[in-house]
């Protein structure tokens, strides 16, 4: 794990590697790992249950908190979690700005709210024309 520093936040970066049994489909591994723990909080299983209860079981997050990436022909893969992001669907006519973080038993509501606001600030500045991406 490493830490990357950005103007608004520090980002933890993890590289995960392993070996699969030849009979294991890649997509099964990817599906089993989503949503990532950095998005749900801990313990992950209970956090996911709470999220389904709060958000509704039929309330998809869309691409937010999913991943973008690829499987290569050599058996490798590279994926990035979609967190601080902005999407604009033609049918909606407005931008959706995704930002958030993991909640734990030690979380403080006000501090989590401020952290989420800081995380979305860079994306908002770009959308408002006040900044450019590094």
Residue ranges and their predicted role:
Residues 1-6:
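Short acidic, Gly/Ser-rich segments with clustered Asp/Glu that frequently serve as metal-coordination loops
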Residues 7-134:
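Conserved hydrophobic core element of enzyme catalytic domains
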